[in-house]
Amino acid sequence: PAGSTFGEYPLEVNTGNLNPDYKTVLVLKLKSSSPGSTIGAQYDTLKITFVGCLSLLDGNYSVAITSAGLTAVRTNEVVTLTDINTFRTRYVGRYTLGTFSPAGYTFIDICDEISLPKNQTLGGYSNKVYGTSFYGDGIDGIVTSETTFEVVHNIAFADGDQKQTYLYTRL
């Protein structure tokens, strides 16, 4: 219907032959079947990611956070599982605990490729926290071993966005 921002489409996928160790992406290009109706450009591509690998990144870490040429090391970082393969950190940027509420930032790990969901802000402020695709298209971080992972994202400020680089090491 006019003005709608979503629609329904039944889709059955037999996942039996998908690789359980790597993500499989199904890309659908949407077109209207009703005369006179259109699909906005921002909605014309639908990506569905099938994941066989469950992420185990939740836990306690030491993290080195670098931005604006300075590095802060936090030895009490806690990465919390909030949903399937979705996590929330305790720290964002080099800021101390309690600076923002909610604290930290959210990321998703799909088969050792980390991405930041859109529309994150710095605590209750309007500053956007967003991915940079530093490691490839849509990839804002990588899991480098069973005990380490890296993330790069930006925080938007009025005087210019600031790159944040994190190196997490499991304790």
Residue ranges: model-predicted function:
Residues 1-6:
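Short proline/glycine- and polar residue-rich coil/turn motifs
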Residues 7-32:
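Contiguous beta-strand segments of beta-sheet-rich domains
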Residues 33-44:
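Beta-sandwich strand segments
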Residues 47-49:
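Extracellular cadherin-type adhesion modules in metazoan precursor proteins
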Residues 51-171:
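Ser/Thr/Gly/Pro-rich, low-complexity flexible regions
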